[in-house]
Amino acid sequence: MQDCIICGGAQETNLYSVASFDGIQSFSIREDNPAKASRPFDRDRDGLVPGGGAATVIIESYEHAVKRGAPILAEIVSWGFSGNGDHISTPNVAGPARSLELCLNKGGISPQQIGYINAHATSTRIGD
């Protein structure tokens, strides 16, 4: 087992990725107000705003972090995965719900102990 790992990824925005989202009519039409255009889980949502991005996360074992005196900002106590076989743009509720259930059971924690969930949302009725 590794003491420390670096995880990262990036997505570029290009003609083909934009065209694929345009083809399924998933863009917001609120281009006159970009700051309020993307509204994940909002009742009045009407689509996403395209963009690229990148992120890197450095994860290390608890023991390794303590040994080097690092401030503990968060702890991964469990994880869950469920491939429901649906398309990324039209997920069903059963797959993500099963993932959360597996995570809670494996970690021995209750939903009330969760302080933050980072969700993937498209600001579309079918994707949210």
Name the predicted role of every residue range.
Residues 32-109, 113-116:
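Condensing-enzyme catalytic core mediating Claisen C-C bond formation in acyl metabolism
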Residues 2-3, 115:
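Short acidic/polar active-site loop segments enriched in Thr and Asp
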Residues 3-46, 79-93, 121-126:
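Acyl-CoA/ACP chain-elongation machinery
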